[in-house]
Amino acid sequence: LSAYAGKYICDSDLSAEKKTAMIKELYDRTLGMIEGQTIDTDGKFDTLDGLLSMYEMKTSELLTAASVMGCIAAGADEEKISAARAYAHDVGLAFQIVDDILDVTSTVEELGKPIGSDAQQEKTTSVTLLGLDKARELAKKYTEGAEKALSAFENNEFLCRLTDLLLNRKN
């Protein structure tokens, strides 16, 4: 997937400077995502910090690449790029925490896949570390952080709605 994104960037009409910055961002975030996926294969964490660090690498890194590369392509300033990083970080963590919650609260029909798979694989999740209510609170905190980061952008209504949908999704 990253190779296709890189080819698309190289074939674009963007300046060489923007292409270089975007390829570097894609490269750095792809390495982080691969590291997160590798760490996730063990699936056991003693602390919430360790779990969230893996979630950052596994999910937030990829969202960061997309968000930052969009900003670079649009010619955004450093303030907006920083806000995009903050948004992607928080929305990625919220997404993963909601995924943990759905694994114990959803149905096969709603989720479209077997539920309880994390427990069957003996994976540590935000729910196993915090309990369901605290995991929901943490997902809400990260969702609010993501929405706050979006305040740096004009016409952010769509992304705010999307962020809320991610928190309240059923699958």
What is each stretch, according to the model?
Residues 170-171:
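Short cytosolic juxtamembrane segments of multi-pass membrane proteins
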Residues 1-149, 153-167:
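Mg2+-dependent prenyl diphosphate-binding active-site environment of isoprenoid biosynthetic enzymes
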